[in-house]
Amino acid sequence: MRTSILAACLAIAPRWLPAQAVTSQTARMETGFLDRTVSVNGTMYRYEVYVPSAYATSTDRWPVILFLHGAGERGSNGLLQTEVGLASAIRRDPSRYPAIVVMPQVPTDSVWIGAPADAAWTALDQTTREFRTDPDRVYLTGLSMGGNGTWNLAYQHPERFAAIAPICAFITPFPQLRGSRAIVPRDSGDAFTAMARRLGKLPTWIFHGEVDPVVPVAESRRAAEALKAAAGDVRYTEFLGGGHNVWDETYASKQFQEWLFAQRRSRR
C-alpha cells in the first residue's frame, strides 16, 4: 500500500511542479511600464516601474533610476508622471535607457517633502527587492518640482546614489508652489553651501534654461557655484535661450546618458 501511495505522489508531482515554475518565471519576466503601489502612514501612493524588455532574457543586475515628476503631473492615477520627462524619452528610444526606472506620483497639492518623499524612498526600496538591481548604480533625477525633490532626497541620503541630475530645479522655498518649504535646515546657514557640504563628492549634473520663466536660473547657478567651491563633482549646463522645459533636450542627450551610466557609488 505504501508503495502504491508513493508511486501516485511521484506521478502527480511532475505535473504540478512545472506549473509553479512557469508561474514564477512569468512573474519575473514581466516588462514594460508596470503599475505598482506603496502605502505610507496609511496613504496609498501609485508609481510606475519601467522594466526593459531585455530584462526578461538577462541574468544581470540592472541599474536603477528614480525619476521625480513636476507639479503638472501630480494626481492619483499613477500615469501622468509617465507622460512627461524621462518616460517620454524612453518611449522615443528605449535603447538609450537600459535601466529599471522608478516613477512615483505625488497627490495634487503635494510636493516631494515629508510623506511623498517617504513614498519615493519606499517605492525605490520595493523595486530593488522585486527586481534584480545593482546597488552600485542607483541614480536620481527630477524636473522642476521634481528637481527640488531630487535635491531633497540627495540631501537626506547622498550615500544611496551614484549620481544625481536636477533639471530646472530649486533649493530654496518656492512661494508660488503650495506646500513648498525649506529642504535644508534653517540653522545650517546658506542653503546652497549646506547642500554642497552634504553632497560631498556625489556626481551631480545640473541643467537649467537661461530664460526659464518659472524657476529662476539663479537657483541652479548658485547650486553649481557652491558645489564647485566645495570641490564637489559637478557639471552645469545652461541652455542659451532655453525656457522651463529643457528636460526633453537633457534626457535626449547621448552625452548625459553616457555620463549617468558611467557613475558608480563605489568610486566616490
Predicted regions and their residues:
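Bacterial N-terminal signal peptides
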Residues: 4-15
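A domain-start/cap signature at the N-terminus of enzymes
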Residues: 17-64, 141-143, 185-187, 221-225, ...
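Structural recognition of the beta-strand scaffold that forms the well-ordered cores
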Residues: 48, 64-68, 100-105, 137-141, ...
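Solvent-exposed loop/turn segments at secondary-structure junctions
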Residues: 55, 70-74, 107-111, 144-148, ...
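Active-site machinery of serine-nucleophile hydrolases
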Residues: 64, 68-121
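Hydrolases whose catalytic domains are alpha/beta-hydrolase-1, hotdog thioesterase
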Residues: 149-153
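The feature captures the conserved acid-bearing segment of alpha/beta-hydrolase catalytic domains
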Residues: 163, 168-251
